[in-house]
Amino acid sequence: MPQAEDKRQAAREVIDILHEISTLLNTNLDRTELSLCVSLIENGVNPDALAAVIADLRKETAPTSRHVLPE
């Protein structure tokens, strides 16, 4: 089906462009993560809420910068 292949190619191009923008903005999102975000937004998820969740998850998984001082 040429039409289905055209749609897949267009989707790949969109993700490639979004990945380039994401890289310029230092979002640290890979193509898979961007694709999932696009899918969630297309299905009605609020983009601001999604951004807040991603930021919260990054805070939770970020290594702590606290240093234990010897006593």
Swiss-Prot record:
Pfam families documented for this protein: MOZART1
InterPro entries: MZT1
Compartment(s): Cytoplasm, Cytoskeleton, Microtubule organizing center, Spindle pole body
Keywords from the named record: Cytoplasm, Cytoskeleton
Signal peptide boundaries: none
Gene Ontology BP annotations: gamma-tubulin complex localization; microtubule nucleation by interphase microtubule organizing center; mitotic spindle assembly
GO CC, alphabetical: cytoplasm; gamma-tubulin ring complex; interphase microtubule organizing center; mitotic spindle pole body; spindle
Subunit architecture: Part of the gamma-tubulin complex.
Membership in a protein family: Belongs to the MOZART1 family.
Function: Required for gamma-tubulin complex recruitment to the microtubule organizing center (MTOC).
Name of the protein described by the UniProt record: Mitotic-spindle organizing protein 1
